[in-house]
Amino acid sequence: MSAQKLYASHVPLAPLSRMLLGIGSAVTAISDPKRGDMVAAMGETTAIGPVLENIRKRMESDVVGKRLLLEKPRISNGTIDRKWLRQLPDGTLGKLYSNFLDRLNTSPDARPTVKYIDNLEHLYVMQRYRETHDFTHIALEQKTNMLGEVTVKYFEGIQYGLPMCVTGGIFGGARLLTKNRQELVDRNLPWVVEQATNARFFMAFDWENHFEKQLSEVQKELNITPLSVNM
């Protein structure tokens, strides 16, 4: 077990407890993806130190990523002015993010707080991943239906190497209807592999400083070619 509680929400776990929680949360999350608490627990308990450290190092090697690690900005109701976002022009990242949240009737604070990470630097990496997941959907122009989620999970799995993302892509893909599974294999997967490989590292991007830009401009900065362009 960790020697001490490192932050307010921290729940130190003994190795056996971590393993059991990881297995249990994985089984539940795979069978019922709507269980956000189990998806979050699975993500944290399976995010082994070397994977998070690799993400941290990649962020540190990027000018913007290094600043993010230093300043540790958060994306929450307290830091995002949603009223201002709603007033932004159509097509901007901020307006699309606002529409995304409104459509799902959710908020930035709906993301579970990290609890099971035993390293303060890795804590921020995991929290940042969680808080920027919605921007990945927007940048890739992927819906929050099963096909869209699986496509995003494959992107994140390739870019970040997080076991939860890899597992979510594989098992989520297996749960798709035959038609959607074929669409994933024939169209989305080849595209998302190319995008994840060639795009800028999403974890080292300061999304909150680009709200007033058109999505097409943000995609250009990220080196993302929308799937619709290839159709």
Swiss-Prot record:
<feature type="binding site">
    <location>
        <position position="137"/>
    </location>
    <ligand>
        <name>Zn(2+)</name>
    </ligand>
</feature>
<keyword id="KW-0862">Zinc</keyword>
<comment type="similarity">
    <text>Belongs to the COQ4 family.</text>
</comment>
<feature type="binding site">
    <location>
        <position position="133"/>
    </location>
    <ligand>
        <name>Zn(2+)</name>
    </ligand>
</feature>
<dbReference type="GO" id="GO:0006744">
    <property type="term" value="P:ubiquinone biosynthetic process"/>
</dbReference>
<dbReference type="GO" id="GO:0005739">
    <property type="term" value="C:mitochondrion"/>
</dbReference>
<keyword id="KW-0496">Mitochondrion</keyword>
<dbReference type="InterPro" id="IPR007715">
    <property type="entry name" value="Coq4"/>
</dbReference>
<keyword id="KW-0456">Lyase</keyword>
<dbReference type="GO" id="GO:0031314">
    <property type="term" value="C:extrinsic component of mitochondrial inner membrane"/>
</dbReference>
<feature type="binding site">
    <location>
        <position position="134"/>
    </location>
    <ligand>
        <name>Zn(2+)</name>
    </ligand>
</feature>
<protein>
    <recommendedName>
        <fullName>Ubiquinone biosynthesis protein coq-4, mitochondrial</fullName>
        <ecNumber>4.1.1.130</ecNumber>
    </recommendedName>
</protein>
<keyword id="KW-0999">Mitochondrion inner membrane</keyword>
<comment type="subunit">
    <text>Component of a multi-subunit COQ enzyme complex.</text>
</comment>
<keyword id="KW-0831">Ubiquinone biosynthesis</keyword>
<dbReference type="Pfam" id="PF05019">
    <property type="entry name" value="Coq4"/>
</dbReference>
<dbReference type="InterPro" id="IPR027540">
    <property type="entry name" value="Coq4_euk"/>
</dbReference>
<feature type="binding site">
    <location>
        <position position="149"/>
    </location>
    <ligand>
        <name>Zn(2+)</name>
    </ligand>
</feature>
<comment type="function">
    <text>Lyase that catalyzes the C1-decarboxylation of 4-hydroxy-3-methoxy-5-(all-trans-polyprenyl)benzoic acid into 2-methoxy-6-(all-trans-polyprenyl)phenol during ubiquinone biosynthesis.</text>
</comment>
<keyword id="KW-0472">Membrane</keyword>
<keyword id="KW-0479">Metal-binding</keyword>
<comment type="pathway">
    <text>Cofactor biosynthesis; ubiquinone biosynthesis.</text>
</comment>
